[in-house]
Amino acid sequence: MSNESTRVTVSRGCTASDECAQALERTNDELDRESSVSESRSDEESHEKLSRRRFPTLGIGIWLDLKDRIPYYKSDWVDAFNYRVIPSIVDTYFNNLLPAIAFAQDMFDRTDNSYGVNEVLLSSAMAGIVFGVLGGQPLCIVGVTGPISIFNYTVYEIIKPLNTSYFGFMFWICMWSMIFHLVLAFTNAVCLLQYVTTFPCDIFGLFINVVYIQKGIQILTRQFSAKSGEKSVQDGFASVVVALVMTAFGLFFKLFHYYPLFSHRIRTFISDYSTALSVLFWSSFTHFGGYLHDVKFKKLPITKAFFPTSKVNRPQNTWLAYEPIPVKDVFIALPFGIFLTILFYFDHNVSSLMAQRHQYKLKKPSSFHYDFALLGLTTCISGVLGIPAPNGLIPQAPLHTETLLVRDSNQKVISCVEQRFTNTFQGLMILGTMTRPLLVCLGEIPQAVLSGLFFIMGINGLMTNSIIQRLVFLFSDPNRRDNTSPLMKVSKKSMLIFLSFSLTGFAGEFAITNTIAAIGFPLVLLLSVLVSFSFAYIFPTEELKILDTNVAQKFTIKNLLLENIRDAKFCDKHED
């Protein structure tokens, strides 16, 4: 009943006396106050609803990730009873192990022996086991690669004049970074990942693959100098030949499933084990005798089993590496922690996205908020143990998913074997590699073979990179182009402008990592994401849908979309 009708009713039930007038006045005042309170409550409720729509509940992203993934935890292990798991373990083990050792050598040389093989092996093993068993998305391979090695030795070069403990400083960098990881995860800031498109991912993928090729070349240049410091042309030339021949044969057999030779099963088998067989064969080749006896191939560096590498910068009898540093240095570590968080925010999440591309036809839910929080905890553990902090790997993460794909005879993807066993077991294998017998075996692998593996991984990654594919399309004979390609619908002008943006972004990333300013290259990654927002004003909508699309299907990023998490509640019993 409205206030006006109530007032009329009261006035009719009273005489013209003063008492009736006073009663009427009091009633009207009470109704006015009630109306005012009701309107105030309504305004507050509306404001609460508006706030709730704008800002999701703290931690709701992590809750939704866990809510989606926990029902699949049992099947993540049961589904591992599939043949695709075996070649995936072998391939992922070598793809993760050998490049990590090469980057360990970089850090060993440029941090005065602070980080070595054992630190990198322990970091990769911990990451594989933790994310294999506890991770939300076990397809994403986590370990040590180029960006974090660049970060670690750049920090060392910057703080060396401060005369402070490197491991104490890295401990506080990891502590600050862990705090920022958890803050970003619990405030649902990982939702910003929904705006990451293929443009920055392709740039970063191109950058990583070129860095792998660069690393292979750097390894070969070191083969021309003997341990005594003298030049050794025959050793260097022999190493170059082994690396290039291994690359040629490795790529030939890696791509064997595209050839018409033999049956589909045989082609798949050869392609599956090409990486492992290449490493084993060409490592054995250097022992074939003859003129090879006159060549001294440099081998991979190894150290004492399960002991820290450095005999100067940290105690040898424990993996607890923390050393006290002045309070001012604790706060000097703060901006470095921010840079590390930015690097991992982009590097890890993009690795996870690329491991869940729409063409892989995944069926199980993703996990971004929870995994980023878990990454913060592994970063903390790394600081305590004095090992490089691990994060998502490119190209290892998407390569891992590709090894699990089930294809038909025409190489079309049918499904993917989504499980936890491969990530977990390759982590255990890397941990086992820290034992003395396996370290000795590892020490028999020539550095030339490692260089060849870098070339294989880098070139194989370039062949599937969209930027390279568009360059090839642009310079192809118009009469030989695939008329069914979506790029046929893009004008040459738009193609050139878009490629200019892509190559500029790549050049910026690659250039800054080769300077003292390498610590700031995560900002270049962030800038490439921001640049993509301007494309809507530069390219026609239909062409932009072809040039810059979403990395993963909407099902994969559903917990990153604000419209899906704004009104979500903890322990909500109602399912959509």
From Swiss-Prot:
The keyword Acetylation does not apply. It is a multi-pass membrane protein. Residues 106-116, 161-165, 214-235, 296-329, 395-438, 517-518 are extracellular. One of its GO terms (cellular component) is vacuolar membrane. It is found in: Cell membrane; Vacuole membrane. Its main location: membrane. It comes from the Eukaryota. It holds the Pfam family HCO3_cotransp. The keyword Transport applies. One of its GO terms (molecular function) is borate efflux transmembrane transporter activity. Present with 195 molecules/cell in log phase SD medium. Belongs to the anion exchanger (TC 2.A.31) family. Functions in boric acid/borate export across the plasma membrane, and thereby protects yeast cells from boron toxicity. Involved in the trafficking of proteins to the vacuole. This is Boron transporter 1. The gene is BOR1.
